[in-house]
C-alpha cells in the first residue's frame, strides 16, 4: 500500500505523541496513540471529556485488534466480522489489555474497524487510534474542517484534510456480550 504524503505526515505526528483531527464516516474526529498517556489526556482536555467515560479505538482491519479479541468466543468473533469494516462500534471486554485512560471505569472498550479509506490508511501507518468526535463537550460534532478549526484553533498538532464518509449519523454502538444497542445509528 502506497500511503499519501498527508497521511504519512499525520501518522508521524501521532507517533510523536500529537493529537490530530481527521474526517471519519459521519463527523470529524480527534485522534492520538491510545498507548500514549500524555496524548490521550491532552485530547480529553481539548474536549473537556472526563477520563472515566472511556474512548473509542478505531482500526484499519480486525487483525489490528487481535490483542483484544484473541480469547473471545467464536460466536462473538463472527458477530464482529459480520459487521466490519463499517459504522459499527462494539463494546468488547478489554481484559485489562488497554490502559485505563482509554477504557475509563468500564470493563469493556469501544472498538470499530473503519471503512473510511483515509482513516484506514492512517491506521495502517499508526496502528489503532483513539477516535472521538471533534467537539468540546456539549457542542455539536464538527462536520467541516472549518468547524474543527473554530473549536480548537491552534491546539491540534495536525489536521488531516479529506472528505467525510457520507453517513449522516455517528456509528451504532452495541455491547458485544449482551447485543444491547447503546447508541442507535
From Swiss-Prot:
Gene Ontology CC annotations of this record: cytoplasm
Intracellular or extracellular location(s): Cytoplasm
Keywords assigned by UniProt, alphabetized: ATP-binding, Cytoplasm, Nucleotide-binding, Nucleotidyltransferase, Transferase, tRNA processing
EC number: 2.7.7.87
Cystine connections: none
Reaction(s) the record says it catalyses: L-threonine + hydrogencarbonate + ATP = L-threonylcarbamoyladenylate + diphosphate + H2O
Molecular functions per Gene Ontology: ATP binding; double-stranded RNA binding; L-threonylcarbamoyladenylate synthase; nucleotidyltransferase activity; tRNA binding
Chain ranges of the YrdC-like domain: 4-185
Predominant place of localization: cytoplasm
Catalytic class of the enzyme: transferase
Cited InterPro entries: DHBP_synth_RibB-like_a/b_dom, Sua5-like_dom, TC-AMP_synthase, TC-AMP_synthase_SUA5
Keyword Cytoplasm listed: yes
A Pfam family assignment: Sua5_yciO_yrdC
One of the GO biological process terms: tRNA threonylcarbamoyladenosine modification
The family this protein is said to belong to: Belongs to the SUA5 family. TsaC subfamily.
Function field: Required for the formation of a threonylcarbamoyl group on adenosine at position 37 (t(6)A37) in tRNAs that read codons beginning with adenine. Catalyzes the conversion of L-threonine, HCO(3)(-)/CO(2) and ATP to give threonylcarbamoyl-AMP (TC-AMP) as the acyladenylate intermediate, with the release of diphosphate.
Name of this protein: Threonylcarbamoyl-AMP synthase
Native source species: Pseudomonas aeruginosa (strain ATCC 15692 / DSM 22644 / CIP 104116 / JCM 14847 / LMG 12228 / 1C / PRS 101 / PAO1)
Gene name tied to this protein: tsaC
